[in-house]
């Protein structure tokens, strides 16, 4: 019986990169209600509306485990929740360059995200990052659904992410 050695011929970069230069990444904890907006955004996304050669990833609360995915793309668009004191479902686009540029943490995944940015900067592998935040008013432990108001913001977030992708592609 012959061994299939092909499965062992991939490098880490090959495994985490599909050759696309833009990654759309949703992060959050879907077990915490509205805090899971980024994950819910990715899970409900109609990728057919987007140009070809875009990567999409449900990053969950991945933190450090997302480094190989992020470093293998030139531009990363992140969707996440924030409790920044703004009116609920305010959608904000940030372009953080340093970990201190990220909004206040909500849960453990943001701690990992900020540290991940520091690590990528240190390794000189920091892509251009765009961060869409959706303001939420509360987190509900062990609640799998988004509140109606936050769920209703997903089409607008999708439209804003699509517009940004098209602007990036046209430049």
What are these model-derived regions, one by one?
Residues 36, 40, 61, 111-114, ...:
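Conserved active-site and cofactor/substrate-binding residues in soluble primary-metabolism enzymes
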Residues 11-14, 67, 119-121:
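A generic local secondary-structure boundary/capping motif
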Residues 15-25, 33, 40-97:
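Nucleotide and nucleotide-moiety/phosphate-recognizing core
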Residues 115-171:
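Phosphate-binding/catalytic loops
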Residues 78, 82-129:
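Helix-loop-strand module that forms the ligand-binding subsite of alpha/beta enzymes
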Residues 1-21, 166-171:
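SAM-dependent methyltransferases
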Residues 33-34, 142:
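Secondary-structure boundary/capping motif
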């Amino acid at each position: 019986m012959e061994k299939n050695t092909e499965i062992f011929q991939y490098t880490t970069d090959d495994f985490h990169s599909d050759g696309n230069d833009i990654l759309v990444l949703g992060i959050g904890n879907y077990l915490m209600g509205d805090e899971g907006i980024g994950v819910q955004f990715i899970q409900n996304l109609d990728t057919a509306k987007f140009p070809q050669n875009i990567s999409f990833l449900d990053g969950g609360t991945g933190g450090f485990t997302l480094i190989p995915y992020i470093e293998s793309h030139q531009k990363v668009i992140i969707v996440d929740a924030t409790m920044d004191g703004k009116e609920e479902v305010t959608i904000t686009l940030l372009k953080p360059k340093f970990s201190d540029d990220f909004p206040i943490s909500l849960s453990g995944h943001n701690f990992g995200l900020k540290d991940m940015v520091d690590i990528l900067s240190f390794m000189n592998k920091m892509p251009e990052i765009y961060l869409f935040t959706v303001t939420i008013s509360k987190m509900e432990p062990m609640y799998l659904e988004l509140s109606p108001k936050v769920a209703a913001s997903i089409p607008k977030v999708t439209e804003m992410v699509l517009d940004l992708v098209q602007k990036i592609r046209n430049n």
